[in-house]
Amino acid sequence: RPNADSMYPSKLYPMSPYVVGQSGRPAQYDPVALIVRLAHERSLSIHAWINPMRGMTEEEIQLVEGEYPIRQWYDDPQLRGRYIVSVDGRWYLNPAYDEVVDLICAGAEEALRLYDFDGLHMDDYFYPTTDPSFDADAYASYQASGGALELAEFRRKALDDLVYQLHEMTGKSRVGRIFGISPGGNVDRVFHTQYADVYLWCGVDGYIDYICPQVYFGLEHGSYDFVKVCRTYQDMIQTDSVDLIIGMTFGKAFSGEDPWTSGRAARTFWCGA
């Protein structure tokens, strides 16, 4: 689910342009069924991958059929700007609302029900902005009802609740399925500007089964060198129920180039060549 769409025929999300070429077109085949089958034939584990919050562009959403919640929210002047919010020309889902969280979880449950996935994976597109206007109405309602959290903590709590529900749903869908998240390597940005509380998720039971930080920085990066970032995430883990999996970039392994690892060391580091 790259942009509030679907790589398979879904009752909840429109087909992704990555499959059909343009928003609003029907599916001609099911690539997810094919990928899952081919992966398992090769003894590979495969997880359903979602971007829960990131949606589509203004141009794309206007092509979506009215049967889907994302288009219904766009067409409703009371919900557009609340359930879905435009940031720099792209629409994002706002997890401050139960209805939005319900859609995200239902979409993930649908994928796990329809296909023989081994787990669920949540990518790193969390809050797209620090601007208070993103969820101003939801936050004002929260304060009016007696809520005392600062905006940053309000947003982290919204993400915490979403992550908790996704983890719980994944575990209930089938014994042995796991749920994990791949935050960025810049932990300060992840926590302070994207409002993802990776410390909580890694520190206690019930949120994730694994953390897979995107450690795309080479050994010579001035602030976020590979070893430093790996150790930062390793130190976060305070429970035996969470595993650390290092997310590495296939792009640099393919190209053999990395501005933060010099010379032949780049190719050797990323792909062992």
Where are these regions (language model features)?
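Short, acidic/polar
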Residues: D98-R113, R189-G206, F226, D258-G272
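Active-site-adjacent "subsite" loops/lids of carbohydrate-active enzymes
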Residues: R25, D30-R37, H47-A48, M53-L114
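Conserved, mostly hydrophobic/aromatic
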Residues: A39, I104, A111, L120-D123, ...
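Glycoside hydrolase catalytic-domain groove-lining segments
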Residues: D131-D258
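The substrate-binding groove and active-site-proximal loops of carbohydrate-active enzymes
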Residues: L12-Y29, S86-C105, G147-A158, P213-E220, ...
